[in-house]
Amino acid sequence: YTGMIISTRESKATREKVIRLGVSQISGASKTSVGGYGSPAPEEENSAQFDVSDNRTLDEVVCWLMELGFIPSFCTACYREGRTGDRFMALCKSGRIGDCCHPNALMTLKEYLEDYASEQARRTGSALIRRELGNIPNERIRHIATERLEKIATGQRDFRF
């Protein structure tokens, strides 16, 4: 019940190899310097903690993951719902974590597609979401997720299981 994280320090090729081994978190468009998400610092003031090898945009990483058959997820629901520690482990051990993770991944991807994505990402992601909805085994959860995805398309946000 552990996860592996791979950062943008690694090349695209390395990231593609290891993601198939079970990497559960992957960075995209990371900034490693102080204030890096604000205005870029002049080169002489560069305070980067490490060099980035994968310089693709977040949209490029999201498209790449979808093309590889993965569902990019921006989910923070467990943390926000207090499902940490023993509560989280109980869901994992019972096998019920998928009742949360799968629909939450689809909903957070939908929010990204609506708010930030390129047209290519929207097309690819919309098709992926349609396919993946059918893979939610619990009919009740699938129905609720479908309703929430429709609400996201109308501008509502922040749904979670």
Spans of features found by a protein language model:
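A structural motif corresponding to the C-terminal end of an alpha-helix
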Residues: 1-4, 68-70
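Hydrophobic faces of well-ordered beta-strands that scaffold small-molecule active sites
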Residues: 2-6, 26-28
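Active-site beta-loop-alpha junctions enriched in small/polar residues
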Residues: 7-11, 31
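Charged, low-complexity C-terminal accessory regions
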Residues: 13-14, 25
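Radical SAM enzyme core and accessory elements
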Residues: 16, 21, 30-161
